[in-house]
Amino acid sequence: MDTSDEWIRKRTGIHQRHFAEDGQGVGELGARAAERAIEDAGIDPTEIDFILFATMTPDHLFPGSGPLVAERLGISGVPALDIRQQCASFPFALEVANGLIASGAARTILFVAADTHASLMPFRDWDVVRGNVSRTIPREDFERATAHRGIAVIFGDGASAVIFRATDREGAGLLRSELRSDGGRADHIFIPMGFSRLPFNDPELAASDAHLPQMKGGNLLKAAVRELSELARAVMEQEGIGPEEVDLFIAHQANQRINDAVAAALKLSPERIPSNIARYGNTSSATIGILLDELRHEGRIQEGDLLCFLALGAGLHAGASLFRY
């Protein structure tokens, strides 16, 4: 496509991305992340009594991918709920998990988030994209990718998994949560072609690229900065604290410019709102979990730290969560 490494880095902060192998679905990637999370938590898979699975790129139209993860983990029969808040899935999943645990319906919840974006990208020659071969692509393919450059340079594939457990530790866990959904701005980023309204089996629609994400980048950036800043302030106000009392703000990794603008709005230094988008791109539902895992293993999160999770995704959905680790 007509772009350059400099153009991509300047506008997104992305230096590299990773793509799943052909035929590798979110069930497989999610199960691998889940295995690591289970080992890290020091639990047995049989202790899991509920699964939440977030993706916008499921293995199949139906069933959802949650039961597929359970099967791979050897715990078929555990209830699995797939959620669809796209890039905003983490704070929504945290709210659902907290409710299940508080009600006594579950004690150990596995939350898996995974997305693979091959079907959402304007590339036809994936061997070239993955670097398996070097060859000139047809002019038509070059122009098609360039026309969808706004989304083609952003998304990467990835999976994350988190174990949520009941605790008796005073003041630990989810403290405050603020969630919003606004269908009036669904057109900021969406895929027109789907199922009931614009059938996925219509060849004319497919030829028009209606199966690819359509994004109003400027509108989305402004909405993200405004919503995330407002939501962060809302949960802090509810808790009676200011930004200086939050140890880390862990935000969805959509675009470095968004997170920089949120940091400026909240008067945060860069280290208070860490980023890994340069290494992975936007892995949609998986970004917060991946960043959380890295921060933990780097020793940047300790027991008792106060975290603020922030995310906005297609819908529009947005959420902020104050969480005592």
Q: What residue spans do the PLM features occupy?
A:
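Condensing-enzyme catalytic core mediating Claisen C-C bond formation in acyl metabolism
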Residues: M1-G23, E140-N219, Y325
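Claisen-condensing/thiolase-fold acyl-transfer catalytic domains that form or cleave C-C bonds
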Residues: G27, A31-A34, I38, T57-P58, ...
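Conserved beta-strand elements of the Class I
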Residues: D49-L52, L110, D247, C308
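Conserved beta-strand-centric core segments of catalytic alpha/beta enzyme folds
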Residues: L94-G184, L291-Y325
